[in-house]
UniProtKB/Swiss-Prot annotation:
It is found in: Mitochondrion outer membrane. The keyword Mitochondrion applies. This is Mitochondrial import receptor subunit TOM6 homolog. Keywords: Acetylation, Membrane, Mitochondrion, Mitochondrion outer membrane, Protein transport, Transport. InterPro entries: TOMM6 (IPR029182). The modification N-acetylalanine is found at A2. Residues 1-22 are annotated as: Disordered. Forms part of the preprotein translocase complex of the outer mitochondrial membrane (TOM complex) which consists of at least 7 different proteins (TOMM5, TOMM6, TOMM7, TOMM20, TOMM22, TOMM40 and TOMM70). Belongs to the Tom6 family. The gene is TOMM6. The lineage of its organism: Eukaryota, Metazoa, Chordata, Craniata, Vertebrata.
Length: 74
């Protein structure tokens, strides 16, 4: 992939447009900054709602598994 020459600043400003990452490292760095930005209420709300929804989904889908039941073929 061709890398772009757009500079990436460590601290984003409020009126900065989101960038499109050109590789996995930039994408992971963006996810990390998204998850650890303590000053952005909207991002924190989205992140918390997403984590809550993932927890609800896991609880609903894993509730039918009986870990104490005898396993087939053992």
């Amino acid at each position: 992939m061709a890398s772009s020459t757009v500079p990436v600043s460590a601290a984003g400003s409020a009126n900065e447009t989101p960038e499109i990452p050109d590789n996995v490292g930039d994408w992971l760095r963006g996810v990390y900054r998204f998850a650890t930005d303590r000053n952005d209420f909207r991002r924190n709300l989205i992140l918390n709602l997403g984590l809550f929804a993932a927890g609800v989904w896991l609880a609903r889908n894993l509730s039918d598994i009986d870990l104490m039941a005898p396993q087939p073929g053992v």
